[in-house]
Amino acid sequence: MIDWESLRAIVLDIEGTTCPVDFVTGSLFPYARQHLGTLLSQDDQQAPLKPLLDEVRIAWKHENSAEAPAYSDSQDPLALLPYLQWLIDQDRKLAPLKELQGLTWRHGYQSGALTTPLFADVAPALKRWQQRGLRLAVYSSGSVAAQQLFYGHTSDGDLSDLFERWYDTRLGPKNEAQSYTLLAADLQLPAHAVLFISDSSGELAAAQAAGLQICGSQRPGNPETLSAKWPVVVSSLEALAPSGPPGLR
């Protein structure tokens, strides 16, 4: 069970927790794949993108998968496109890739081509928690900029102001306990005062190892069925309330 008396902050995963997995895999990823070439070919983007592209080149040079496109040492940004598209298809969590994806999504969100379809229970739960004085944060493999776009353009309007902190894999891998130790330290809270909600057993295990409270998210369409070994698993964030609601196990 959740220790609500000691709880001070709730940190949420995104995919499979606050929105359907198929929005990410079926809408966001294809949009980025389609528009990366345009981003890479824009002259006014060359200087801002250079640090990210340099990181991608290093990752490509040291890529150990035989299925990856053959390495090219060309300095033409478009030479990176086959590798970037391959990374998207593999759902790699490479930080510079995630930042590049976020840049393509910015245009999509601002143009109205993309709108985040949150689960219906998410916005009411976030607002209720904030009203109770709980601090809210996001920890996702998507870049911080992409997270802010995600919550700034939802089916329930702009919810970005509800969140105090945003964390991506620049903090550290989501499957490593040290990342959650750093997260709690950044919030300036004891680990037990932080609740992490995710649909991934690897992430839940890492957060639990760091001393955080955890809650599994079991949504329709999630690729993983969470084990009953987790202390709390819910199918709706509305099931989480200090008053001891039904639906916890």
From Swiss-Prot:
Per its record, the protein catalyses: 5-methylsulfanyl-2,3-dioxopentyl phosphate + H2O = 1,2-dihydroxy-5-(methylsulfanyl)pent-1-en-3-one + phosphate
Co-factor requirement: Mg(2+)
Associated pathway: Amino-acid biosynthesis; L-methionine biosynthesis via salvage pathway; L-methionine from S-methyl-5-thio-alpha-D-ribose 1-phosphate: step 3/6; Amino-acid biosynthesis; L-methionine biosynthesis via salvage pathway; L-methionine from S-methyl-5-thio-alpha-D-ribose 1-phosphate: step 4/6
Q: Does the keyword Metal-binding apply?
A: yes
A Gene Ontology biological process noted in the UniProt record is: L-methionine salvage from methylthioadenosine
| SUPFAM superfamilies in UniProt | HAD-like (SSF56784)
Which EC class is this protein assigned?
Answer: hydrolase
Stated EC number for the protein is 3.1.3.77
Keywords, alphabetical: Amino-acid biosynthesis, Hydrolase, Magnesium, Metal-binding, Methionine biosynthesis
Give the record's cofactor note, including how many are bound: Binds 1 Mg(2+) ion per subunit.
According to its UniProt record, what is one Pfam family this protein matches?
Hydrolase
Query: One GO molecular-function annotation for this sequence?
Result: magnesium ion binding
Keyword Cell membrane belongs to the record: no
What assembly does the database describe for this protein? Monomer.
Q: What function is annotated for this protein?
A: Bifunctional enzyme that catalyzes the enolization of 2,3-diketo-5-methylthiopentyl-1-phosphate (DK-MTP-1-P) into the intermediate 2-hydroxy-3-keto-5-methylthiopentenyl-1-phosphate (HK-MTPenyl-1-P), which is then dephosphorylated to form the acireductone 1,2-dihydroxy-3-keto-5-methylthiopentene (DHK-MTPene).
The entry assigns this protein to a family as follows: Belongs to the HAD-like hydrolase superfamily. MasA/MtnC family.
- What is the designated name of this protein? Enolase-phosphatase E1
Q: What is the lineage of its organism?
A: Bacteria, Bacillati, Cyanobacteriota, Cyanophyceae, Synechococcales
